[in-house]
């Protein structure tokens, strides 16, 4: 129904609250379950497999927001937000930017300025899951003192009544219930207590909380969709008969091969996710401790976290496609199997930022050239490329370029 009517899965999310699942990894004294990263991956997988992938993705973003607050928890945020998630308070993350696409770490269109008692914050987001429906929003902007340094980021938490959202703009191929519409916080006042962590902490908290929880949770979601599609194919092919040859569809070796490969590939992806989640558990006491500001625990595993997302998103596209082949024309219809919904939902995995193209390059580039080669904020000079291009210049072109650079340097010095 959520898929057909573009309905936000509020009821499904609220159903998770009484048993503590909205605070899955929060301490029990805050109303949480005190669980770990492995359980988190299993929960998102289960919701996507047996329920609704839109709900699973909204849950992932909610957990990301909750854990970003927990990473830099204060008495204020504990009482106002974290202890209330058991009552059905739903959060989300808003990290995208209309100017930089899936490069969500580079918020060109956002900003903040310090004022008495807090900050005035501008946040423009091209995609925000649960936009207009979540109760609180953890968002990232450049810091008040960023001075052109886009690595100087800060994080704020704001309430629903402060933001402007346009959920009616969301009409996507899949994940149709998650309402990933645009969001605007138009230089609204945000009290100082709602700064999450210190000024300039955004890049560190992104690596330590936002990225790890998104990548673990979304990978679980894609694996859950794969498992759900396999479930559907097994149920259908074991009862569908071809009376002319006296065989069920599952009796054909080609169907057995396809299902077998799908199971093996999906279980390999699941094992990879649970393995990385277990590694995170070991360095955080089962998600119950966090490193000091400026240090990393989960963030040291980014290279592996990128890989699990790439693998799960790649696998789900292949698996659901093959299960559709196994189910034939019946699978192509919306009813009765609903396999086509799994196919559409699974397509989101590849394009959800960081996209698989970005992740593939990240992994390869860092393996070959080191993490510093990524240059997230486009500040490193590629001297090799620069010197190579200069060799192509004629003497006159070099003089022209030199004159221009000297003039620019003079202008910059005067303005400074």
Across the structure, where does each feature detected by a protein language model lie?
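Glycine-rich beta->alpha junctions and the first turn(s) of the following alpha-helix
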Residues: 171-267
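C-terminal helix-coil-helix/basic helical segment that borders enzyme active sites and/or dimer interfaces
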Residues: 2-3, 267-311, 324-332
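Short segments within alpha-helical structural elements
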Residues: 318-325, 357
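Glycine-rich phosphate/pyrophosphate-binding beta-alpha loops
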Residues: 126-132, 214-218, 349-353
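Glycine-rich phosphate/cofactor-binding loops in nucleotide/flavin-utilizing enzymes
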Residues: 327-416
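Glycine-rich flavin
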Residues: 7-18, 22-129
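A short core secondary-structure module
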Residues: 124-166
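Generic structural signal for well-ordered, non-transmembrane alpha-helical segments
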Residues: 224-227, 260-267, 306, 310-317, ...
